[in-house]
């Protein structure tokens, strides 16, 4: 943990220009510095926006809400630095809000249990309509934080942060991306010509994690002439079984006037839903996208819940991806059939990161922040895989 949050990331921060901080709290934060403590009932199942129904993650201490800088309407990145200590694992957390105060999908990752002050240097992506933010620390046993600062970062800075982190992780085999854009001619044409492209990441909290790995920074760095506006649009534990209905589609997709929709996550089949029903609801969602002029990428499920029996370094068992396997969250036969039926592009976010995790021999929780969700390590494996499809597939602009 110290290598991840201390040496590697602090070293990456050494080259960063000292932008004026948007939020800065020297010393230990608390009620005297304007922060608020919010309690919780331990063990109670609660609805967490953009994540779903889970046992309460614990109480939180949260900053006052503050205004973001940068141009509204474009993706931005922010470097968050702090030191923290907590008796049990918890979460650092950033909530976002639009100009009217409506909550947008959050960014959060793991606080590692430690009796000593541990430095963190993390990168936080904000979507185009984000206008305000709030920082929080969440644990079941109480967390302490000090020297909290959040400042704007450039695309290059954010991409470097990603690549520095990736260099500390198990080797990730590049996915096959030669024909990644073959079914996306309109989007590719706009990317190559520098025209604005609205991209919607649609799914569940796992799709939110795909976003939170700062994949957009890697994509924008690989395609510097492109004018990409990337939006994350998610609902906890939700997939096409919900989004295929017109009122939900309009709320989560159509309002962004997308040129490209990425459908992903692990919730595109409700556990009570037959495989054929899941396939049909995905087909209908894709057809709705096409009807409003958007092209579609269907992403296979990235790693989430543990799929290994133990931490032995073994090859990834691809049988786990079959419909009806014991790893419900990785099944994708119906996903591949829906893409084939509709002519949507299919990008594999399963194989490369799952193979890297399988071969690593790392402990079962080394890539995760809780049972379902990845920490910055797991997120980065997914982000690098997704960025490879964008960059390598649209070779006309790759540096």
Predicted regions and their residues:
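Extracellular and organelle-lumenal recognition/adhesion modules and their flexible linkers in secreted
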Residues: 18-178, 182
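Catalytic His-Asp segment of secreted/periplasmic serine-dependent ester chemistry enzymes
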Residues: 303-399
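Residue-level recognition of beta-strand->loop/alpha-helix junctions
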Residues: 232-236, 300-301, 348-351
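A short helix->loop->beta-strand "cap" motif at the edges of active sites that frequently abuts
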Residues: 291-295, 344
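Bacterial N-terminal signal peptides
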Residues: 6-15
């Amino acid at each position: 943990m110290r290598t991840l949050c201390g040496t590697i990331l602090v070293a990456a921060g050494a080259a960063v220009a000292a932008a004026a901080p948007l939020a800065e709290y020297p010393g230990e934060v608390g009620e005297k510095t304007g922060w608020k403590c919010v309690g919780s009932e331990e063990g109670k199942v609660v609805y967490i926006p953009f994540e779903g129904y889970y046992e309460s993650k614990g109480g939180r201490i949260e900053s006052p809400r503050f205004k973001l800088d940068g141009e509204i309407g474009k993706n931005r990145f922010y470097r968050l630095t702090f030191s923290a200590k907590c008796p049990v694992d918890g979460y650092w957390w950033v909530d976002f809000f639009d100009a009217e105060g409506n909550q947008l999908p959050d960014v959060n990752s793991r606080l590692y249990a430690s009796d000593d002050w541990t430095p963190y240097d993390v990168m936080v992506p904000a979507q185009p309509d984000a206008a305000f933010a709030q920082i929080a620390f969440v644990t079941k046993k109480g967390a302490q934080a000090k020297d909290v600062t959040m400042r704007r970062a450039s695309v290059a800075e954010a991409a470097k942060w990603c690549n520095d982190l990736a260099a500390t992780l198990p080797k990730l085999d590049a996915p096959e991306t030669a024909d990644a854009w073959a079914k996306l001619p309109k989007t590719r044409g706009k990317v190559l010509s520098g025209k604005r492209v609205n991209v919607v990441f649609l799914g569940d909290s796992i799709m939110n994690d795909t976003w939170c790995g700062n994949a957009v920074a890697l994509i924008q760095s690989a395609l510097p002439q492109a004018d990409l506006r990337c939006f994350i649009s998610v609902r906890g534990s939700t997939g096409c079984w919900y989004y295929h209905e017109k009122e939900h589609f309009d709320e989560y997709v159509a309002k962004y006037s997308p040129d490209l929709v990425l459908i992903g996550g692990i919730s595109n089949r409700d556990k009570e839903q037959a495989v054929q029903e899941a396939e049909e609801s995905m087909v209908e969602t894709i057809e709705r996208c096409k009807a409003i002029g958007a092209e579609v990428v269907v992403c296979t499920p990235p790693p989430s819940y543990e799929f290994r029996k133990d931490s032995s370094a073994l090859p990834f068992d691809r049988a786990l991806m079959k419909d009806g396997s014991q790893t419900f969250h990785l099944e994708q036969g119906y996903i591949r059939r829906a893409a084939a039926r509709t002519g949507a592009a299919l990008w594999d976010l399963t194989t490369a990161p799952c193979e890297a995790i399988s071969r690593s021999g790392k402990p079962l929780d080394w890539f995760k922040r809780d049972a379902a969700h990845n920490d910055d390590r797991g997120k980065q494996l997914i982000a690098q895989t997704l960025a490879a499809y964008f960059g390598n597939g649209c070779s006309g602009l790759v540096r």
